[in-house]
Amino acid sequence: MKVLFATGNIGKYHEAKQILARYGIEVERVDLDYPELQSDSLEEIAAYGARYCAESLGQPVIVEDSGLFIEALNGFPGPYSAYVFDTIGNEGILKLLEGEENRKAEFISVVGYCEPGGRPVTFTGEIRGRIAEEPRGEEGFGYDPIFIPEGEDSTFAELGVEEKCKISHRTKALERFAEWYKNNVAGR
């Protein structure tokens, strides 16, 4: 079984490849630049992206959109996480939280799947945690150096990709997709 993953993010691709391999699903990356829907809903963004890519490629495809929701910042950056990271980075987020005791945060990932002419299906995964006082660790990408998952003392970047892929928001969303895919699409 093989699925196309439309993403320009090589880190996401490697994580998806590792996670979906457990289900016997091979992942092929397609670097398709598609317009991102401006919405406060990760589900809407992922569904739109999946439909757009499936129609553009003429093949079934998955996309993934994720957001970091920080409680003290009223859920910011949320669905705008990629833009905010590119604009102010981890240092900017830490600056916004300077002096803030409430560092609770949640990472949410939504995987969207669509076939050409079909309706998109979405799968959500989430993980609670907190924002570190400073960036820590070398592995991963994006907000990994500042996000500490609940029950851990290490950031995602300190845990490393293999450990992160056992517990992350993206893992949960991809596992939900994989179960659905095996039961509804594979072998058709």
UniProtKB/Swiss-Prot annotation:
Binding site for substrate: T7, G8, N9, I10, G11, K12, S66, F141, G142, Y143, D144, K164, H169, R170
An example molecular function term from Gene Ontology annotations: ITP diphosphatase activity
Active site: D65 (proton acceptor)
Pfam families per UniProt: Ham1p_like
Residues at which Mg(2+) binds: E36, D65
Family: Belongs to the HAM1 NTPase family.
Name of this protein: dITP/XTP pyrophosphatase
Source organism: Methanopyrus kandleri (strain AV19 / DSM 6324 / JCM 9639 / NBRC 100938)
Lineage: Archaea, Methanobacteriati, Methanobacteriota, Methanomada group, Methanopyri
